[in-house]
Amino acid sequence: MPLTGLGLYGGHRGSRWLRNRIKVLKQFVVPSLQAQTNKNFTLWISVRQEDRHDKQVKALKEYFDSIREFETVFTYSGLCFWDDKLSDKVARDRLVTNLHGTIGELMNHIGGVSHVLMTIQPSDDCYKNGVVQGLQGVFREMPELQAVGFLKGYMMNYLTGELAEYNPVTIPPFFTIKFPKEVFIDPLKHLEYTGPYKSHEYIADKLKFGTIQERSFIVGCHGENVSTVFSHPYKGESVSREVLKDFGLKDVPNLKIKVSLRKWLLRKLPHKVQRKLRYVFGERFWNRIYEFLRA
């Protein structure tokens, strides 16, 4: 679980963003993890080195240390998958560096296993309660698979409680990669084993990929998302909140966070317009400044 964004400054988006993301994590994601029928997993939370002593991060670590249902490990070397917001060279160099720093921190938690299953767990999205059990079973029954993912799920407006189908036309970032242990713990082998895939849509081009058709994840929308909003084109039919009981979220209240006027106005625009404005005034502008300073 990356507790950071993508792009410049290691994905740092400010203390307000972090405060709101931690609130989402505690209110929605943690209950869905506690609801897993199989708790034989370790929640790996990756944080930037610069945030190791951040008050909010330290408080969050203490919070997870108090949870006994599953193990949690924090690492402080940044994002450990390909950052497609950066140029290929910068993304590759940064990923190798981050993996070098992270693997050492993870070694004591890996143990004497032959393989490591690494599941993408966003810090604001949720999995159905049988996902851990189901994924481990699929890899036992089909050992030739290198990755398994879900193609469809739900999306939820955490602010209003609205729930709908989520029907992407490409592979969404809800999959598990199976690494041989000796590959997982070697940064260069780790990178090459995954392709590297440069965005979740292309994971099946790099690894032998299996799919699960059952809707088993929730994409959370809360006003602080970088790209996914509740008016997304992949949004399908509205569904009953009854499905939330299978995610450990049946009685979860609506999220209450402060959203800036700028973001409130942005959410009122059509999805395509929102994406264009984010690119023009965000990613493209700051990328040019960043590349100029690096030159």
PLM regions: where:
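Hydrophobic targeting segments
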Residues: 1, 13, 32-33, 41-46
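Short loop/turn segments at strand-loop or loop-helix junctions that form parts
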Residues: 1-11, 47-48, 75-79, 151, ...
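Active-site-proximal specificity loops/subdomain of glycosyltransferases
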Residues: 10-15, 49-117
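Short, acidic, metal-binding catalytic loop of nucleotide-sugar glycosyltransferases
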Residues: 17, 28-40, 62-67
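Well-ordered, non-membrane alpha-helical segments in soluble/globular domains
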Residues: 17-30, 57-59, 97-100, 133-134
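Conserved catalytic core of nucleotide-sugar-dependent glycosyltransferases
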Residues: 86-111, 119, 128-208, 212
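Active-site acidic Asp-centered loop
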Residues: 121-123
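C-terminal catalytic/acceptor-binding lobe
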Residues: 176-295
